[in-house]
Amino acid sequence: MWRCKENSDSGFTLIELVIVIVVLGILAAIAIPRLFSVSKEAEIATVDNMVANLESALAIYVSKQYMDGQPVAAHNPFDDLTNVPSNYVGVNDPVNPTNTPDGKWSFRTTGGWIMYNPKAAITGGWTSGGERFIIYQIQAVVDGTDTVGLRLTTTPAYDYSWN
């Protein structure tokens, strides 16, 4: 005689689904903080790289001025970059925090400030309108009475650290 095969369900049991959800939750709890840490590290590296590019632009500007017999004066180093970064918003003077949103650079002619509004949290920096900015100031390098170079420095009053 012919026997009929029993009809069995091939789905997941409730216990199996709960175990999968718990495992996914644990993986998410581990992965999400690491993802934020990686994005903060990437932002720190990007800021350091941009500062190095701007310092190089200032050095090239100084060299050109000497070669042309022109005086060296503080100016916006973003103007000297061959490829201005897409996150540079231009001159922001007087400072309006809404003109330099998170992750953007701007230049303040008053004081020769290069300003960056970080996405990641920082302690210290310069505060305006509830926003914290990282400030680099263009300073003259002098020999006697001659300006022989320009450099970017942080001002002790606006020191910062990444959280």
Predicted regions located by residue number:
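N-terminal leader/signal peptides at the extreme start of proteins
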Residues: 1-10
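Alpha-helical hydrophobic helix detector
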Residues: 18-34
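Phosphate-coordinating loops and pocket residues in cytosolic domains that bind phosphorylated ligands
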Residues: 37
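Extracellular/periplasmic head regions of type IV pilus-like filament subunits
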Residues: 63-122
